[in-house]
């Protein structure tokens, strides 16, 4: 079944496919691989493609999309393409140039969705992660409401069809929602979300504000050594997920993805393996029972794989609050 028929309506009237393809890969993976796997994903039925300035793959991902348009597989309007504003570009005058740069790299006229990648502003400049002589990350202090106003201007200019945020907590979302003169609400909040960190309170809050929660690391992350504790439990080896996979004759990954869809969460499936990319679109072919869902709900242990210790002292560190 083609996943493009399964969409959620955003608060600005646009539609987002509920299954997305995540394109991030650790630096040791050759960039050319992003081109190859994004093409495979589109061939398999993915229509929602998630990238970012941080991923350093927008040229390859854009080329993959354009090549599938050129060969007649899809039209541009069939594809929902997301990019993200990196933390070194939060100052309002840097927002539009950053988006224009992303569009230039992807060679696309617009993005379907542009997100503030993180609430934690960093010192502007070429470095993705600017550090001082002691190796400490250099923060910047920016009023994110001014960043948001610059995002709104990008939507008005037609450079982004929709705008949203990522890695925001409730307080940070409320700051935007309560901003005097708010023109557009964020359509979504893209956060780490999986059975070990199910974000149920944040999900309920987002639903109450007509903001879609989008899950990244829905399969428990790629366990990139730079971010993830190698001793943390491996989500897809969880006995409950494995038992449900056996029961439904599916993979544990499909159980984890289906869980999110049934909670009303848009889910990103990241894989650089052809067989698993094809498997992941089977998420629409089966259903979990209420008991299955309850069993998966019970796995929550408030475990975030992305261990941002170097950012814990940032005034906008999102995990300082309960949710």
Swiss-Prot record:
Keyword check for Cell inner membrane: no
Site positions (Lowers pKa of active site Tyr): 84
One Pfam family named in its UniProt record: Aldo_ket_red
Site (Involved in ligand recognition and product release): 227, 306
Source organism: Homo sapiens
Compartments reported by the entry: Cytoplasm
Chain sites annotated for binding NADP(+): 23-24, 50, 166-167, 190, 216-222, 270-272, 276-280
Protein name: Aldo-keto reductase family 1 member C3
Similarity field: Belongs to the aldo/keto reductase family.
InterPro entries found in the cross-reference section: AKR, AKR1C, Aldo/ket_reductase_CS, NADP_OxRdtase_dom, NADP_OxRdtase_dom_sf
CDD domains with a match to the protein in the record: AKR_AKR1C1-35
PROSITE patterns linked to this entry: ALDOKETO_REDUCTASE_1, ALDOKETO_REDUCTASE_2, ALDOKETO_REDUCTASE_3
Residues flagged as site, Important for substrate specificity: 54
């Amino acid at each position: 079944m083609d996943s493009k028929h399964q969409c959620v309506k955003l608060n600005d009237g646009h539609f987002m496919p509920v299954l997305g393809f995540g394109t991030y890969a650790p630096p040791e993976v050759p960039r050319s691989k992003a081109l190859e796997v994004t093409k495979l994903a589109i061939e398999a039925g993915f229509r929602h493609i998630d990238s970012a300035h941080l991923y350093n793959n927008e040229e390859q991902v854009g080329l993959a999309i354009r090549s599938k348009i050129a060969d007649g597989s899809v039209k541009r309007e069939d594809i929902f393409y997301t990019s993200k504003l990196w933390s070194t570009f939060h100052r309002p005058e840097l927002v539009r140039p950053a988006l224009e740069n992303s569009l230039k790299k992807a060679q696309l006229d617009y993005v379907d969705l542009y997100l503030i990648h993180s609430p934690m502003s960093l010192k502007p400049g070429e470095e993705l992660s600017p550090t001082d002589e002691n190796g400490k990350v250099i923060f910047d202090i920016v009023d994110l409401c001014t960043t948001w106003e610059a995002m709104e201007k990008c939507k008005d200019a037609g450079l982004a069809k929709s705008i949203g945020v990522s890695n925001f907590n409730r307080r940070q979302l409320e700051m935007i929602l309560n901003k005097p003169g708010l023109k557009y609400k964020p359509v979504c909040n893209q956060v780490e979300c999986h059975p070990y960190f199910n974000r149920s309170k944040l999900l309920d809050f987002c639903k109450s504000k007509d903001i879609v929660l989008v899950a990244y690391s829905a399969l428990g992350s790629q366990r990139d050594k730079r971010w993830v504790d190698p001793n943390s439990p491996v989500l897809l080896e969880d006995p409950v997920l494995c038992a449900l996979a056996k029961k439904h004759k599916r993979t544990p990954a499909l159980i984890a993805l289906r869980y999110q869809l049934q909670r009303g969460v848009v889910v990103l499936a990241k894989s650089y393996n052809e067989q698993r990319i094809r498997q992941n679109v089977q998420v629409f072919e089966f259903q979990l029972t209420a008991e299955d869902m309850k069993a998966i709900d019970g796995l929550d242990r408030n475990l975030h794989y992305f261990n941002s210790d170097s950012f814990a002292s940032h005034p906008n560190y999102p995990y300082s609050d309960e949710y």
